[in-house]
């Protein structure tokens, strides 16, 4: 499995036509091998968007491990 070199987080917010805020949290994970993994979570709160981004990150890592598992 790759070793993580860095994780960068960014948050974006937009207002809809009803002046309600919506958020996007972007996680950029750089591995020592140079591979880059980007996961984005959307939500009505920053916490919801962050949780969704980290959930996608977890699923991506599990998929990566499963695709390299030899049975």
Curated annotation (Swiss-Prot):
- Specify the superkingdom: Viruses
Recorded hits in Pfam families, A to Z, give:
Corona_3
What is the protein name given in its UniProt record?
A: Non-structural protein 3a
């Amino acid at each position: 499995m790759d070793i993580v070199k860095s994780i960068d987080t960014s948050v974006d917010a937009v207002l809809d036509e009803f002046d309600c805020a919506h958020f996007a949290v972007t996680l950029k994970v750089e591995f020592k091998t140079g591979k880059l993994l980007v996961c984005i979570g959307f939500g009505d709160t920053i916490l919801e968007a962050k949780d969704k981004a980290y959930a996608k990150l977890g699923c991506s890592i599990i998929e990566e491990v499963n695709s390299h598992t030899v049975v």
